[in-house]
């Protein structure tokens, strides 16, 4: 259709299918198998489902972006054979700068298995060359779980502390504060700092590759779950392949 500046990914679609609520298109799909496209964007969460959830509180650039989606699609589908646009298989898709990538859901599991085979192969080679030791491999759990546990705990209890310090936050209908983006940025920076510190303290340069194995293993486990239960997020296997390239 020649849409400019597409921004989307199939994870959004998979999560949408898991939600209990429907959209305006649901009745058309269920009653007449009539296909459609949902447009959605998220920002200024504090306006969502409030009296301020109107066009006056939307960014003009965001509305213009929706128009850039709508007009080419109207032109395309008004001239298309609608009997030939029925999809036979869902696809994984995501945006990267200057292009839009997609591939069938059926590729997700094989891509995960292939990544797993390469992971085991590199692990075997590293053990054979005495680059890896089981002792150091398992010690890699210390900075990994330490970073996850401390960052997760500080984020959870930090937010609880903010709710205690500012009880008026509990009155917000959607739970997103007016300075919510600042809180998100602060907690992200805090989490990254904790991660860097944990690996600085517990992962000496000579054993970094050993500790890297556990990070890749966790990513492999996550992608195994994704391949089975959240296929739309299948593109998250791609960072694993880059990790394997560095690993190899």
Task: Walk through the language-model features, giving the residues of each.
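Cytosolic-side membrane-insertion boundary helix
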Residues: 85-116, 131-137, 178-183
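Generic structural signal for well-ordered, non-membrane alpha-helical segments
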Residues: 21, 59, 63-67, 114-117, ...
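Short, surface-exposed, charge-dense and proline/glycine-enriched linear segments
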Residues: 38-52, 71-74, 109-125, 203, ...
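Alpha-helical transmembrane segments of integral membrane proteins
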Residues: 117-248
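Soluble extramembrane regions of membrane proteins in the secretory/endomembrane system
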Residues: 1-103
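A sequence-level detector of short, solvent-exposed, charge-rich linear segments
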Residues: 58, 70, 89, 112-115, ...
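Proteins with a high burden of low-complexity, intrinsically disordered sequence enriched in S/T/G/P/A and R
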Residues: 1-7, 12, 17, 90-92, ...
């Amino acid at each position: 259709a020649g849409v400019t500046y597409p921004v989307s990914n199939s994870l959004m679609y998979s999560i949408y299918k898991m939600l209990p609520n429907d959209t305006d298109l649901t009745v058309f799909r269920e009653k007449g198998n009539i296909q459609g496209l949902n447009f959605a964007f998220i920002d200024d969460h504090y306006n969502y489902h409030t009296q301020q959830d109107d066009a006056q509180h939307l960014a003009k650039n965001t509305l213009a972006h929706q128009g850039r989606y709508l007009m080419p699609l109207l032109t395309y589908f008004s001239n298309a054979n609608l009997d030939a646009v029925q999809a036979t298989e869902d696809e994984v898709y995501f945006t990267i700068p200057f292009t839009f990538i997609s591939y069938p859901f059926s590729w997700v599991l094989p891509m995960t298995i292939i990544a797993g085979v390469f992971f085991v192969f590199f692990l075997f080679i590293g053990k054979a060359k005495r680059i890896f030791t089981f002792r150091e491999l398992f010690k890699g759990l210390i900075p990994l779980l330490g970073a996850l546990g401390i960052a997760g705990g500080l984020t959870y209890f930090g937010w609880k502390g903010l709710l205690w310090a500012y009880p008026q936050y509990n009155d917000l209908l959607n739970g997103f504060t007016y300075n919510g983006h600042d809180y998100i940025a602060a907690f992200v920076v805090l989490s990254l700092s904790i991660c860097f510190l944990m690996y600085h303290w517990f992962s000496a340069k000579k054993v970094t590759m050993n500790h890297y194995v556990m990070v890749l293993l966790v990513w492999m486990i996550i992608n195994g779950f994704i391949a089975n239960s959240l296929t739309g997020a299948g593109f998250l296997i791609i960072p694993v392949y880059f990790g394997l390239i560095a690993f190899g």
